């Protein structure tokens, strides 16, 4: 926030705002790059891509649009098709390519961890990443970003879509586990998601919580402003589920797309050819 104040910049609400801020900040001697974001080949880059698609108004598959920034998560009556030939897909890819001009030289090696570490070292003025990694600067007094960071939903490509996705982990039981072990496993799963454990995770660095009672704990709120900001985003309906719709073949789709879109972003392959390849690759996992 200190660098934004230095240049009298408003927090970017749209991708155009973001590019403007990057252009202003690119000459600042205090930082190496205006922004850092995950762009490593495979899952990190593909995730950045499909989240940008969401900011341009489309999920990566053809969920039914309801209105505003809402898509129907019920796919039982839908013949699923990939959305990588949509206008949103083209716009998202072009935006990410523009963003490379304001990003670290080693951007193509940045997964989520490297991205936030770069920001926490004061090398970039902004970062696009998950809140769970904010401990690298929120709880680190040696970080130049300590107590100098503001939080926003991801910037909008289309006006209604200044939104960010829900992250998290899925806990399950393997189908081949011995039946007598299931009660023990279930007991541990319940412990892992209990308010007591969630608070423990937060106190040891995971600055996110799916449990309202924990988020509203004064001790938790005092750790970082991030909880108030995420709570505000949720109340404003800017936290969405559909951007990373959890299909069984999601990981396969994302890994393939992340390799293909890399060729456009970093190797200058033709965009239409790249997106046709993404569409074909994703569709084979949907058939």
What is each of the regions a protein language model found here?
Residues 22-24, 63-108:
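Glycine-centered hinge/linker elements that transmit conformational signals in sensory
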Residues 6-7, 80, 101-102, 139-209, ...:
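Extracytoplasmic/periplasmic substrate-recognition and gating elements
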């Amino acid at each position: 926030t200190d660098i934004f104040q230095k240049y009298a910049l408003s927090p970017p609400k749209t991708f155009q705002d973001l590019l403007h801020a990057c252009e202003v900040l690119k000459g600042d001697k205090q930082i190496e790059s205006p922004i850092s974001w995950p762009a490593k080949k495979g899952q990190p880059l593909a995730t950045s891509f499909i989240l940008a698609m969401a900011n341009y108004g489309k999920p990566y598959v053809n969920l039914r649009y309801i209105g505003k920034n809402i898509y129907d998560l019920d796919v039982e009556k839908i013949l699923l098709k990939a959305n990588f030939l949509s206008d949103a897909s083209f716009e998202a890819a072009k935006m990410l390519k523009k963003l490379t001009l304001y990003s670290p030289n080693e951007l193509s090696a940045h997964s989520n961890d490297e991205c936030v570490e770069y920001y926490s070292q004061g090398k970039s003025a902004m970062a696009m990443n998950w809140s769970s990694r904010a401990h690298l600067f929120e709880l680190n007094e040696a970080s130049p970003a300590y107590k100098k960071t503001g939080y926003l939903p991801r910037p909008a490509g289309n006006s209604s879509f200044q939104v960010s996705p829900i992250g998290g982990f899925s806990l399950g039981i393997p189908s081949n586990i011995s039946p007598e072990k299931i009660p023990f496993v279930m007991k541990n799963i319940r412990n892992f998601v209990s308010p007591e454990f969630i608070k423990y995770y937060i106190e040891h660095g995971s600055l996110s919580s799916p449990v309202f009672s924990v988020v509203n704990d004064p001790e938790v709120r005092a750790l970082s402003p991030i909880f108030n900001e995420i709570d505000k985003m949720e109340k404003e309906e800017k936290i969405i589920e559909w951007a990373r719709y959890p299909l069984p073949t999601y990981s396969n789709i994302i890994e393939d797309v992340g390799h293909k879109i890399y060729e456009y972003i970093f190797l200058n392959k033709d965009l239409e050819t790249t997106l046709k390849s993404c569409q074909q690759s994703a569709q084979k996992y949907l058939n």
